[in-house]
């Protein structure tokens, strides 16, 4: 078990949860994000399917600005993983997406209006 500082409860420490908790701690401790602007396992508003975003980051006005999709370290980050996070973003329409397995991280900036994206160096 590990204490999730966002949900304020202990959760089962699976490999994916290890990645999520380490990324959350990085956001708070290194990125300076206030815990109150970070959501965990937030339900996607796009579809009626029971899908949840691993991490959703808001700006200081409360608007969502970034989705983080966490995978277990043994999962290869491929097109299927990106398709998943892009699908989640149809409901949130955030400008930034991050995919991580704790070992490899990809970030991209989304230009929703022009249907383009740009990978960022992280």
Go through the PLM ranges and name each one.
Residues 1-96, 103-122:
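A short, conserved, highly charged catalytic patch centered on acidic carboxylates
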């Amino acid at each position: 078990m590990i204490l999730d500082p966002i949900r304020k409860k202990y959760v089962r420490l699976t490999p994916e949860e290890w990645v999520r908790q380490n990324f959350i701690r990085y956001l708070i401790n290194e990125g300076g994000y206030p815990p109150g602007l970070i959501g965990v396992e937030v339900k996607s508003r796009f579809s009626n399917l029971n899908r949840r975003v691993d991490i959703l980051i808001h700006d200081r006005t409360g608007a969502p600005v970034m989705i983080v999709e966490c995978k277990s370290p043994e999962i290869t980050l491929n097109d299927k993983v990106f398709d998943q996070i892009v699908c989640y973003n149809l409901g949130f329409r955030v400008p930034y997406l991050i995919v991580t397995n704790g070992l490899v991280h990809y970030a991209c900036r989304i230009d929703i209006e022009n249907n383009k994206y740009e990978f960022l160096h992280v």
